[in-house]
Amino acid sequence: MQDAMDFDKFITCNQESCPEYGIVFGSNNTNVLLVKAGQGGSARGYRNKYLKLVHEIRNAYGMSVVCSSTPDTEINQMEHAMQALTKEGLLTADTRIYFVGFSKGASIGCLQGTAFPQITRYLLVNPPMMINLPKICRIAKNYSGEGMAFVFGSEDPSVNLAGLLHLHERENMTVRILPGQDHYLSRDNFDLTDLVAKELLR
C-alpha cells in the first residue's frame, strides 16, 4: 500500500545536474501548481515540507501538483520543468500553471519563467536579491501577467532590497513582508499552505 504522504510518481534523472520531480495527480489538470525548491533542495523539502504542501493543495483544490528539486546546474530549469510536465500530460493548450519558488527556486522562476505564457501566476518567496538584482527588478517592472507576488521574511538577508521592488508595486505585482520570519519561514509553525492559498490561488 502506498504511503499517503508520498508522491504518486517520482521522476529521477541519471545525471546529477538534472532536476527531479515529485508529482501528485489531481482531478483538475487545467490548473497545475509547480513548486520549485531552493538551491540544492529536494522535491520533498526539508522534513517533507513540500510533500505536505502538495497533498494539502491537491486535497483542497483538486489540482495536480509538481515539486521540482533545484540542482546546481547551467541548464534552463524552467524549460526542463515544462518538458517534464508535457511528458506527463500535465501541460496542454488549456493549462494554467501556478508557480511557487523558494530562494534560488524563486529567482529561477522569475528569471526564466516569464518565457512560458502558460505560467499565469507567481509566488516568489525570499529570492536572493543580491544575485541578478537589476534583472529581477526589470522583470517585476515590466511584468504584464495575471499576478506576481514577492514575499520576504522580515529577517531574510534580501529584505532590505525589497524596497526596490516596492517601487514597481501595482495590482498585478505585489510585495509582502512577513514579520519575524527568516529565510526558511521556519518560525512559529508557519503555515505554508495558507501562504500559497492567499497569495497565489486566491
Regions found by a protein language model. Give the residues of each.
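Alpha/beta-hydrolase active-site loop
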Residues: 49, 71-92
